[in-house]
Amino acid sequence: MIECGLIEKIVSGDDSDPKARIARAAIGEFALRSLDGARIREIAKISGTNVAAISYHFGGKEGLYNAVVAGMSDYFDKIVGPYYEEGAEICAAKNCAAARALAIRFLIDAIRKFSTVKIVPALCLIMSREAASPSEYFQRVYGSIYEKPVEFLARLFITASGGRTEHGEAVVFAQALWSNVRIYSSKSEAILRLHGWRDMGELEISLLEKSLSKVLEKTLK
């Protein structure tokens, strides 16, 4: 399994570790062509290694894909884990205002952090493909990147509404907002054009935060 530290090396741009170079090249190839279509020789070429090195470090293409998915999920869990801990305390205390504030901070911080990571658009493609056509690795992606954050937000929304929002309704609302985090984090051409933005920096994220705050205030009264 690819360790979380290896994904951090990819994010930081550290090319000293051949495993990180292989994984970075693999992320791009899996995003573009899927597991079945990915070209192991192309991954070796892009990473400046060879097929033997990929087999040595990951056991082949299947092992490399498993490592990328596991590393992606572990990296995500490490980023958002502190929010989950804080949310559990807030929900236990039934603090409506704090729950609303944390929901906004969680969503905006996620966009702020992930929109600056160059490999996120490729990771989003891998996530979307797994969601649309699940492989044996789907559960790992689903648990970390779909189920946990949506359930977390749903609990915050229920708490923020003073318990008036039912779980099913909260999940629908949470999923709608969480989907937008992935969309904005990928900084797709469609999103930039829709808003008339040339890029998405701090100014644009601040506008999103203001809009989101208004939506949550009106919805979670």
Q: Can you describe what each PLM-predicted range is?
A:
Residues 1-17, 87-88:
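N-terminal intrinsically disordered/low-complexity leader segments
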Residues 147-171, 219-221:
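Hydrophobic alpha-helical bundle segments that form small-molecule/ligand-binding pockets
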Residues 21, 29, 33-71, 75:
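Helix-turn-helix
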Residues 22, 26-30, 177, 216:
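Short hydrophobic clusters on alpha-helical segments that form packing/core surfaces
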Residues 82-120, 170-177:
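Hydrophobic alpha-helical connector segments
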Residues 120-129, 166-188, 207-211, 215:
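Hydrophobic alpha-helical segments that form the core
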Residues 69, 73, 139-150, 205, ...:
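Amphipathic, non-transmembrane alpha-helical scaffold segments
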Residues 117-140, 188-194:
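Amphipathic alpha-helical segments used for helix-helix packing
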